[in-house]
Amino acid sequence: IGTQIVXNXMKSIKNIQKITKAMKMV
């Protein structure tokens, strides 16, 4: 269960980083 939570957190962090990069580009 713990590993799934970590994986989900990593995915969410990557998504947030993509959004922040897109915002910076604009």
Swiss-Prot record:
Give its localization.
Mitochondrion; Mitochondrion inner membrane
User: Quaternary arrangement and interactors, per the entry?
Assistant: F-type ATPases have 2 components, CF(1) - the catalytic core - and CF(0) - the membrane proton channel. CF(1) has five subunits: alpha(3), beta(3), gamma(1), delta(1), epsilon(1). CF(0) has three main subunits: a, b and c.
For this protein, the record's Gene3D superfamilies field holds: ATP synthase, gamma subunit, helix hairpin domain
Q: What is this protein's function per UniProt?
A: Mitochondrial membrane ATP synthase (F(1)F(0) ATP synthase or Complex V) produces ATP from ADP in the presence of a proton gradient across the membrane which is generated by electron transport complexes of the respiratory chain. F-type ATPases consist of two structural domains, F(1) - containing the extramembraneous catalytic core, and F(0) - containing the membrane proton channel, linked together by a central stalk and a peripheral stalk. During catalysis, ATP synthesis in the catalytic domain of F(1) is coupled via a rotary mechanism of the central stalk subunits to proton translocation.
Q: Name one GO cellular component term.
A: proton-transporting ATP synthase complex
The similarity annotation says: Belongs to the ATPase gamma chain family.
Question: What is the protein's name according to its record?
Answer: ATP synthase subunit gamma, mitochondrial
The membrane-topology field of this record reads: Peripheral membrane protein
Highest rank taxon of the organism? Eukaryota
Q: What one GO molecular function would you report for this record?
A: proton-transporting ATP synthase activity, rotational mechanism
Q: Which InterPro entries is this protein grouped with?
A: ATP_synth_F1_ATPase_gsu
Q: Which gene encodes it?
A: ATPC
Keywords for this entry?
A: ATP synthesis, CF(1), Hydrogen ion transport, Ion transport, Membrane, Mitochondrion, Mitochondrion inner membrane, Transport
Origin organism is Spinacia oleracea
Q: Does the keyword Transmembrane apply?
A: no
